[in-house]
Amino acid sequence: MRSKFYFPPFRNIKKYFLALLLACLHLTLLTNEARANCVFDEDQVKINIEDYKNRLHGFWLGQSIGNWTGLITEMDKIGSKSTMPFYTDNDWGKSDQPAFWGELVPHSQTIDFYLVSDGNHWGADDDTDMEYLYAHLHALHKSSKLTPEQIREGWLKHTYSEEDAPFYKKFDHSTPHRENFLWVSNEKARILMEDGFVPPETSNPKYNSKSSMIDAQLTTEIFGLLSPGNPQNAIDMAYLPIRTTATGNAALVANFYVYMHSLAFELHPSDILGENLKELAIEAAQLFPSKSTPKKIFEYVLSHYDNNTDKQDWEHTRNAIYERYQVQSNDGYIYKEPFDSMINFAASLISLFYGDGDLKRTIQIAALVGWDSDNPSATWGGLLGFIYGANSIKNVFSETNLSDTFWIHRTRRNFPTSYKDEPGIDHFHEMANRETLIVNRVIEEKMSGCIDNNLSLIHI
């Protein structure tokens, strides 16, 4: 992605893995008696642990495909005169156009799926690295719910400030500049943390003027996967991470995505997956107060989709939400900027409904629809990736031997992980293994669930 990158000092790998081993042993000792006494009921929901690991692997792989595909078109089309007209299906496979700030992207000149082959690494981005951070903190603290202090300490340790960030060159000819890969509300929250603030005060509009932006809805979806089948517990786990950067309607929308991810374990690839996802979205939208802006936006986009006889013509609905919300302002929403939570929530629903459960089509529409396009493409890529599982994703993109490694130190720092002696590199399979341990803990501590003595099934 760039010719030079500064790697911070890497230490204490052995110490980390020893701590992880002790944590696993501690979890085993704590739960052996509970597992021995657990009564399994035929009516209980059962989750195959190895299958769940494959699904978590698929979440990271699908999210990375969606993220890096969406980054090609990110902020290219935001409804301003200088960026019009919007993209359509006809633009797929054609040359990328500059973002509204005037730059292209270094990783692709063509609007198409961006796939990283084995031997190379998927780069971290703000759509993936904060979820990685939160999963790491849960494993580190052996906790089912993070405290405000744990979140603050984790952010300060693993993210850069604007002053100590490495120098970054977007293109070979670019002038190097410091880049901490934090923007909008994330950046505001970190500055507040440096001043001693902790969540939820880091999203208080009194101090954080960007708390109505998109940040939380792209950094917290993983909490749904850490609490399968219990969306209310997932939302409780995500309460502070969401309110690290979001308040009001932005926080409500983040809850919506967490809810959908929590119940996604019940879904599998099928001819009716699109309809199942639509029903799940309708259920998740019950979280919204009846007269709230997110509720009205959801109902408008859903109604426009349902009434559109051509289910390939997603552009018709995109143009309608542009007119209704950006040009005219309706349903209590006044458009401010292309990072707004609400306009991107509406845009994400377009790709969810018209994508109809098809991984490729959903990512394609999300990348073309406009505004902050890498966010819905990453969100739905991750959700569908989880539903499909890693093995099925690789069949969908069989033309490429897809990479399973993740370069977390592209954007963040101080993570005690390496792959083939390369610091800051992780593997999706190992990430899924660690996250399954978190799921085990959450189910036993928060959901009165059981794990059988063979560690093969989770009973909820």
Briefly describe each language-model feature range.
Residues 71-115, 128-130, 148-169:
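Active-site-surrounding "flap" and adjacent substrate/cofactor-binding loops of secreted or lumenal enzymes
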Residues 18-28:
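Bacterial N-terminal signal peptides
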Residues 458-460:
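Conserved small/polar residues in nucleotide/adenosyl-binding loops
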Residues 65, 69, 76-92, 246-249, ...:
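Catalytic phosphate/nucleotide-handling subdomain of diverse soluble enzymes
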Residues 1-13:
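N-terminal secretory signal peptides that target proteins for export/translocation
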Residues 47, 185-213, 220-231, 239-244, ...:
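Accessory "access/gating" subregions that flank catalytic or transport cores
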Residues 61, 120-126, 130, 135-254:
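Active-site cavity-forming subdomains of large catalytic enzyme subunits
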Residues 31-36:
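Boundary at the C-terminal end of the N-terminal hydrophobic targeting segment
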